Amino acid sequence: MTKRCSWVKMTNQLYIAYHDEEWGQPLHDDQALFELLCMETYQAGLSWETVLNKRQAFREAFHGYQIQAVAEMTDTELENLLENPAIIRNRAKIFATRANAQAFLRLQEEYGSFDAYLWSFVEGKTIVNDVPDYRQAPAKTSLSEKLAKDLKKRGFKFTGPVAVLSFLQAAGLVDDHENDCEWKNSN
């Protein structure tokens, strides 16, 4: 039988596929990184399962996470999303998506890509942590605090150290698969 991290909800096929096919896989595509960062910001105060279940609706609402298109969304477009029952209708998070797209574009301009900026924090290599049980893993680290501080300085919203650590794990910069998970250190 396949051994996965114990946090995976085995009753939800989206959750299983997310763990097996995405979570912890080193990600270098700026658009995919933007989508993942947005998803982590939506999670604040909610379950990851809720965000995953609404992922496709978010993609449709935010132009497939085309960064320039999201950065150019009007206040009216964003306000209209508050009426969309298929997404998380939190005004601050919806407006943060546009602000984050704008900040993302500035970082792309400065570094050539968000990928180059992001991976510079780990010197281009995945950090593999010892995680016998995810319940004992820290919610934030010095790395996530450093990146969160820099993102905030650059105008990003909803990117505190806990959300940032989740993002780093999901994007494969930090391998926090449990030690007995078949996906541990698979990259």
Regions found by a protein language model. Give the residues of each.
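HhH-family (HhH-GPD) DNA N-glycosylase catalytic core used in base-excision repair
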Residues: 1-187
